[in-house]
A protein has these predicted regions:
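FAD-site-proximal beta/loop scaffold in flavoenzymes
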Residues: 46-62, 146-225
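Rossmann-like dinucleotide-binding cores of NAD(P)H-dependent redox enzymes
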Residues: 57-58, 63-67, 73-138, 142-143, ...
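Short loop/edge segments at beta-strand edges and connector loops
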Residues: 1-4, 9, 33, 52-54, ...
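Glycine-rich dinucleotide-binding loop and its adjacent helix/turn
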Residues: 31-91, 120-121, 168-185, 189
Length: 346
Protein backbone atom coordinates (compact mmCIF):
# COMPACT_ATOMS: atom_id res chain seq x y z
CA UNK A 1 0.00 0.00 0.00
CA UNK A 2 1.56 3.29 -1.07
CA UNK A 3 0.50 6.10 1.20
CA UNK A 4 1.05 7.90 4.49
CA UNK A 5 0.19 6.05 7.68
CA UNK A 6 -0.70 7.34 11.12
CA UNK A 7 -1.93 5.64 14.26
CA UNK A 8 -5.54 5.90 15.34
CA UNK A 9 -4.84 3.81 18.44
CA UNK A 10 -2.55 0.99 19.58
CA UNK A 11 -4.21 -1.51 17.21
CA UNK A 12 -5.22 0.60 14.21
CA UNK A 13 -3.58 2.78 11.57
CA UNK A 14 -5.02 5.11 8.98
CA UNK A 15 -3.43 5.13 5.52
CA UNK A 16 -4.01 8.08 3.21
CA UNK A 17 -3.23 7.36 -0.42
CA UNK A 18 -4.24 8.52 -3.87
CA UNK A 19 -7.07 6.01 -3.74
CA UNK A 20 -8.50 7.44 -0.54
CA UNK A 21 -8.31 6.47 3.10
CA UNK A 22 -7.91 2.96 4.46
CA UNK A 23 -7.93 1.71 8.01
CA UNK A 24 -5.89 -1.31 9.00
CA UNK A 25 -6.02 -3.21 12.26
CA UNK A 26 -3.52 -5.69 13.59
CA UNK A 27 -1.97 -7.36 16.58
CA UNK A 28 1.49 -6.07 15.75
CA UNK A 29 2.99 -3.07 13.97
CA UNK A 30 6.57 -2.35 12.95
CA UNK A 31 7.68 1.27 12.63
CA UNK A 32 10.65 1.54 10.26
CA UNK A 33 10.36 5.07 8.90
CA UNK A 34 14.08 5.80 9.04
CA UNK A 35 15.65 9.19 9.45
CA UNK A 36 16.45 12.30 7.45
CA UNK A 37 19.42 14.68 7.38
CA UNK A 38 19.48 17.11 10.27
CA UNK A 39 19.23 20.71 9.08
CA UNK A 40 20.26 23.42 11.57
CA UNK A 41 18.54 26.78 11.82
CA UNK A 42 21.54 28.57 10.34
CA UNK A 43 21.33 26.81 6.99
CA UNK A 44 18.71 26.49 4.25
CA UNK A 45 19.63 23.80 1.70
CA UNK A 46 18.37 24.55 -1.80
CA UNK A 47 19.28 21.28 -3.53
CA UNK A 48 21.45 23.14 -6.05
CA UNK A 49 24.45 24.67 -4.29
CA UNK A 50 23.72 24.01 -0.62
CA UNK A 51 23.12 20.29 -0.35
CA UNK A 52 22.06 17.70 2.17
CA UNK A 53 23.49 14.19 2.01
CA UNK A 54 20.27 13.04 0.30
CA UNK A 55 20.92 15.48 -2.54
CA UNK A 56 24.18 13.68 -3.28
CA UNK A 57 22.75 10.24 -4.10
CA UNK A 58 23.70 10.61 -6.91
CA UNK A 59 25.01 14.18 -7.27
CA UNK A 60 23.24 16.20 -9.95
CA UNK A 61 26.56 17.69 -11.02
CA UNK A 62 30.21 17.03 -10.27
CA UNK A 63 31.23 20.14 -8.34
CA UNK A 64 34.44 21.98 -9.11
CA UNK A 65 34.92 22.61 -5.42
CA UNK A 66 32.92 21.66 -2.37
CA UNK A 67 32.93 22.33 1.36
CA UNK A 68 31.85 19.40 3.51
CA UNK A 69 30.46 20.41 6.89
CA UNK A 70 30.69 17.55 9.36
CA UNK A 71 33.60 15.19 9.93
CA UNK A 72 31.77 12.10 11.16
CA UNK A 73 31.37 8.88 9.19
CA UNK A 74 29.05 10.35 6.56
CA UNK A 75 31.12 13.49 6.16
CA UNK A 76 34.42 11.71 5.51
CA UNK A 77 32.78 9.32 3.06
CA UNK A 78 31.57 12.28 1.03
CA UNK A 79 35.03 13.82 1.21
CA UNK A 80 36.40 10.60 -0.26
CA UNK A 81 33.70 10.50 -2.95
CA UNK A 82 34.02 14.09 -4.14
CA UNK A 83 37.83 14.12 -4.02
CA UNK A 84 37.76 10.94 -6.13
CA UNK A 85 35.66 12.85 -8.67
CA UNK A 86 38.43 15.45 -8.87
CA UNK A 87 36.75 18.19 -6.85
CA UNK A 88 38.67 20.55 -4.61
CA UNK A 89 37.41 19.55 -1.17
CA UNK A 90 37.54 21.39 2.13
CA UNK A 91 36.38 19.56 5.25
CA UNK A 92 35.14 21.71 8.12
CA UNK A 93 36.11 19.87 11.31
CA UNK A 94 34.58 21.25 14.50
CA UNK A 95 37.11 19.38 16.66
CA UNK A 96 40.83 18.68 16.36
CA UNK A 97 40.48 15.36 14.54
CA UNK A 98 38.13 13.82 12.03
CA UNK A 99 35.93 10.94 13.16
CA UNK A 100 35.47 11.99 16.80
CA UNK A 101 34.89 8.94 18.94
CA UNK A 102 36.86 6.66 16.64
CA UNK A 103 40.38 5.35 17.20
CA UNK A 104 42.75 8.36 17.06
CA UNK A 105 45.34 6.40 15.07
CA UNK A 106 42.71 5.42 12.52
CA UNK A 107 41.55 9.03 12.29
CA UNK A 108 45.15 10.20 11.84
CA UNK A 109 45.70 7.69 9.03
CA UNK A 110 42.62 9.00 7.23
CA UNK A 111 43.68 12.61 7.71
CA UNK A 112 47.09 11.83 6.19
CA UNK A 113 45.38 10.16 3.23
CA UNK A 114 43.09 13.15 2.74
CA UNK A 115 45.98 15.60 2.84
CA UNK A 116 47.83 13.45 0.32
CA UNK A 117 44.87 13.81 -2.04
CA UNK A 118 44.83 17.58 -1.68
CA UNK A 119 41.91 17.81 0.73
CA UNK A 120 42.01 20.87 2.99
CA UNK A 121 41.16 20.33 6.65
CA UNK A 122 39.74 23.28 8.57
CA UNK A 123 40.11 22.08 12.16
CA UNK A 124 38.57 23.59 15.26
CA UNK A 125 36.05 25.44 13.13
CA UNK A 126 32.34 25.24 13.84
CA UNK A 127 30.12 26.31 10.94
CA UNK A 128 27.54 28.96 11.80
CA UNK A 129 26.18 29.79 8.34
CA UNK A 130 26.17 28.58 4.75
CA UNK A 131 25.14 31.24 2.26
CA UNK A 132 24.84 31.58 -1.50
CA UNK A 133 27.39 33.95 -2.97
CA UNK A 134 27.21 34.53 -6.70
CA UNK A 135 27.72 31.21 -8.47
CA UNK A 136 28.98 29.56 -5.32
CA UNK A 137 28.64 29.38 -1.57
CA UNK A 138 30.48 30.58 1.49
CA UNK A 139 30.68 28.67 4.77
CA UNK A 140 31.15 30.96 7.76
CA UNK A 141 32.68 29.65 10.98
CA UNK A 142 32.45 30.83 14.56
CA UNK A 143 36.10 31.90 14.66
CA UNK A 144 35.77 34.18 11.64
CA UNK A 145 37.23 31.80 9.08
CA UNK A 146 35.37 31.29 5.81
CA UNK A 147 35.39 28.65 3.09
CA UNK A 148 34.36 29.54 -0.45
CA UNK A 149 33.38 26.82 -2.90
CA UNK A 150 30.98 26.13 -5.75
CA UNK A 151 28.95 23.80 -3.51
CA UNK A 152 28.55 22.79 0.13
CA UNK A 153 27.12 19.66 1.71
CA UNK A 154 25.75 19.28 5.23
CA UNK A 155 26.71 16.06 6.99
CA UNK A 156 25.98 16.78 10.63
CA UNK A 157 23.79 13.88 11.60
CA UNK A 158 20.18 12.88 11.21
CA UNK A 159 16.84 13.03 12.98
CA UNK A 160 14.05 10.46 13.13
CA UNK A 161 11.03 10.44 10.84
CA UNK A 162 8.25 10.39 13.42
CA UNK A 163 6.21 13.44 12.39
CA UNK A 164 2.77 12.56 11.10
CA UNK A 165 2.73 9.09 12.67
CA UNK A 166 0.44 10.31 15.46
CA UNK A 167 2.33 8.19 17.97
CA UNK A 168 0.51 9.87 20.85
CA UNK A 169 -2.70 8.17 19.76
CA UNK A 170 -1.00 4.81 20.20
CA UNK A 171 0.75 5.84 23.40
CA UNK A 172 4.25 5.25 22.00
CA UNK A 173 6.97 7.05 23.93
CA UNK A 174 9.99 8.87 22.51
CA UNK A 175 13.36 9.44 24.14
CA UNK A 176 14.87 12.86 24.82
CA UNK A 177 16.33 12.97 21.29
CA UNK A 178 13.00 12.27 19.62
CA UNK A 179 13.71 8.64 18.73
CA UNK A 180 11.34 5.80 19.59
CA UNK A 181 12.16 4.01 22.83
CA UNK A 182 12.57 0.24 22.43
CA UNK A 183 13.48 -2.65 24.70
CA UNK A 184 15.75 -5.62 24.01
CA UNK A 185 13.04 -7.14 21.79
CA UNK A 186 12.84 -3.87 19.80
CA UNK A 187 9.34 -3.45 21.25
CA UNK A 188 8.11 -0.03 22.31
CA UNK A 189 6.38 0.69 25.60
CA UNK A 190 3.14 -0.38 23.87
CA UNK A 191 2.81 -4.14 23.51
CA UNK A 192 2.72 -5.21 19.88
CA UNK A 193 4.28 -2.04 18.47
CA UNK A 194 7.92 -2.40 17.43
CA UNK A 195 10.52 -0.08 15.91
CA UNK A 196 13.63 -0.86 13.88
CA UNK A 197 16.28 0.99 11.94
CA UNK A 198 17.30 4.61 12.34
CA UNK A 199 14.01 5.59 13.97
CA UNK A 200 14.87 3.38 16.97
CA UNK A 201 17.84 5.57 17.85
CA UNK A 202 20.31 2.70 17.87
CA UNK A 203 23.28 2.37 15.54
CA UNK A 204 22.24 3.78 12.13
CA UNK A 205 23.54 0.81 10.15
CA UNK A 206 21.74 -1.33 7.57
CA UNK A 207 23.13 -4.45 9.23
CA UNK A 208 21.65 -3.41 12.57
CA UNK A 209 18.25 -2.65 11.03
CA UNK A 210 18.18 -6.04 9.30
CA UNK A 211 19.09 -7.84 12.52
CA UNK A 212 16.44 -5.90 14.44
CA UNK A 213 13.86 -7.06 11.91
CA UNK A 214 14.96 -10.64 12.39
CA UNK A 215 14.78 -10.37 16.18
CA UNK A 216 11.31 -8.82 15.96
CA UNK A 217 10.11 -11.69 13.78
CA UNK A 218 11.52 -14.19 16.27
CA UNK A 219 9.80 -12.44 19.16
CA UNK A 220 6.48 -12.25 17.35
CA UNK A 221 6.60 -15.93 16.45
CA UNK A 222 7.58 -16.95 19.95
CA UNK A 223 11.04 -18.23 19.11
CA UNK A 224 12.39 -20.19 22.04
CA UNK A 225 15.62 -21.37 20.48
CA UNK A 226 18.26 -22.24 23.06
CA UNK A 227 20.78 -20.18 21.09
CA UNK A 228 18.60 -17.06 21.01
CA UNK A 229 20.59 -13.95 21.87
CA UNK A 230 19.40 -10.43 22.36
CA UNK A 231 21.02 -7.72 20.30
CA UNK A 232 24.17 -6.28 21.82
CA UNK A 233 24.74 -3.01 20.01
CA UNK A 234 28.18 -2.63 21.60
CA UNK A 235 29.33 -5.61 19.54
CA UNK A 236 28.12 -4.40 16.16
CA UNK A 237 30.84 -4.10 13.53
CA UNK A 238 30.92 -0.97 11.40
CA UNK A 239 32.96 0.22 8.45
CA UNK A 240 33.82 3.55 6.88
CA UNK A 241 34.19 3.32 3.12
CA UNK A 242 36.99 5.73 2.44
CA UNK A 243 40.49 5.13 1.16
CA UNK A 244 41.86 3.67 3.34
CA UNK A 245 38.88 1.77 4.66
CA UNK A 246 38.35 1.87 8.42
CA UNK A 247 36.43 -0.72 10.41
CA UNK A 248 35.97 -1.39 14.10
CA UNK A 249 34.02 -3.50 16.55
CA UNK A 250 33.61 -3.87 20.28
CA UNK A 251 35.56 -2.05 22.96
CA UNK A 252 37.59 0.94 21.77
CA UNK A 253 41.03 1.66 23.17
CA UNK A 254 40.15 5.22 24.19
CA UNK A 255 36.92 4.05 25.83
CA UNK A 256 38.79 1.47 27.91
CA UNK A 257 41.34 4.02 29.09
CA UNK A 258 38.61 6.53 29.93
CA UNK A 259 36.88 3.93 32.10
CA UNK A 260 40.12 2.83 33.73
CA UNK A 261 39.87 -0.67 32.32
CA UNK A 262 43.04 -2.65 31.82
CA UNK A 263 43.44 -3.99 28.30
CA UNK A 264 46.11 -5.43 26.07
CA UNK A 265 46.51 -3.65 22.73
CA UNK A 266 48.41 -5.30 19.90
CA UNK A 267 49.02 -3.41 16.67
CA UNK A 268 50.37 -5.06 13.53
CA UNK A 269 51.02 -3.23 10.22
CA UNK A 270 49.78 -4.82 7.02
CA UNK A 271 53.29 -4.38 5.66
CA UNK A 272 54.24 -7.48 7.67
CA UNK A 273 51.95 -9.68 5.55
CA UNK A 274 53.04 -11.13 2.19
CA UNK A 275 49.60 -10.48 0.66
CA UNK A 276 49.88 -6.74 1.27
CA UNK A 277 53.23 -6.72 -0.49
CA UNK A 278 51.75 -8.72 -3.37
CA UNK A 279 49.04 -6.05 -3.67
CA UNK A 280 51.73 -3.37 -3.46
CA UNK A 281 49.60 -1.77 -0.76
CA UNK A 282 51.37 -2.09 2.60
CA UNK A 283 49.45 0.75 4.22
CA UNK A 284 47.26 0.32 7.26
CA UNK A 285 47.20 -1.83 10.34
CA UNK A 286 45.27 -4.23 12.53
CA UNK A 287 44.73 -3.40 16.18
CA UNK A 288 43.44 -6.13 18.49
CA UNK A 289 42.14 -5.39 21.99
CA UNK A 290 41.95 -8.17 24.57
CA UNK A 291 41.66 -8.76 28.30
CA UNK A 292 45.18 -9.18 29.74
CA UNK A 293 44.00 -11.66 32.36
CA UNK A 294 41.67 -13.93 30.39
CA UNK A 295 42.83 -13.37 26.83
CA UNK A 296 39.25 -12.71 25.70
CA UNK A 297 38.97 -10.65 22.52
CA UNK A 298 37.19 -7.40 23.40
CA UNK A 299 37.42 -5.41 20.18
CA UNK A 300 39.56 -4.21 17.35
CA UNK A 301 40.20 -1.65 14.65
CA UNK A 302 41.41 -2.22 11.11
CA UNK A 303 42.69 0.42 8.70
CA UNK A 304 43.49 -0.53 5.13
CA UNK A 305 42.44 -2.59 2.15
CA UNK A 306 39.34 -4.74 2.76
CA UNK A 307 39.01 -3.56 6.37
CA UNK A 308 35.23 -3.90 6.09
CA UNK A 309 35.63 -7.57 5.22
CA UNK A 310 38.34 -8.45 7.72
CA UNK A 311 36.57 -6.89 10.71
CA UNK A 312 34.01 -9.71 10.58
CA UNK A 313 36.64 -12.08 11.98
CA UNK A 314 37.10 -9.90 15.05
CA UNK A 315 33.33 -9.33 15.28
CA UNK A 316 32.77 -13.08 15.48
CA UNK A 317 35.46 -13.39 18.14
CA UNK A 318 33.90 -10.59 20.21
CA UNK A 319 30.35 -11.94 19.90
CA UNK A 320 31.33 -15.54 20.67
CA UNK A 321 33.61 -14.51 23.57
CA UNK A 322 36.61 -16.12 21.89
CA UNK A 323 40.14 -15.73 23.18
CA UNK A 324 43.26 -14.73 21.32
CA UNK A 325 44.35 -18.36 21.67
CA UNK A 326 41.34 -19.37 19.58
CA UNK A 327 42.56 -17.13 16.77
CA UNK A 328 46.05 -18.56 17.06
CA UNK A 329 44.69 -22.10 16.77
CA UNK A 330 42.79 -21.24 13.58
CA UNK A 331 44.37 -22.24 10.27
CA UNK A 332 44.09 -19.16 8.06
CA UNK A 333 44.75 -19.04 4.32
CA UNK A 334 48.24 -18.06 3.20
CA UNK A 335 48.91 -15.60 1.73
CA UNK A 336 46.05 -13.46 3.05
CA UNK A 337 45.61 -10.07 4.66
CA UNK A 338 43.84 -11.87 7.52
CA UNK A 339 47.22 -13.20 8.61
CA UNK A 340 47.74 -9.82 10.26
CA UNK A 341 45.03 -10.89 12.71
CA UNK A 342 47.09 -13.96 13.60
CA UNK A 343 50.17 -11.80 14.11
CA UNK A 344 48.17 -9.50 16.39
CA UNK A 345 46.87 -12.46 18.38
CA UNK A 346 50.38 -13.82 18.74
Amino acid sequence: IKGEASFCGPNEVRVNSSGGEQRLTGDAFLIATGSRPRIPEWCSPDGERILTTRDCYPPKVFPKSIAVVGSGVTGVEFVHMFSSFGAEVTLVVSRQQVLPGKDPEAAAALEDAFLGRGVKLLKGARATAIERQGDGVVVKCDDGREVKATHAVLAIGSEPNVEGLNLDAAGVELDTRGYINIDRHCETNVKGIYAAGDVSGKLPLSSVAAMQGRKIAEHLMGSNRATHRHLDYDKAASAIFTQPEIADVGLAEAEAFANGRKIRVTKVPFSSTPKALIHNDPHGFVKLISDPNTGQVLGGTIVGRHAGELISVIALAVTAHLKVADLLDTLFVHPALAEALLDAAE
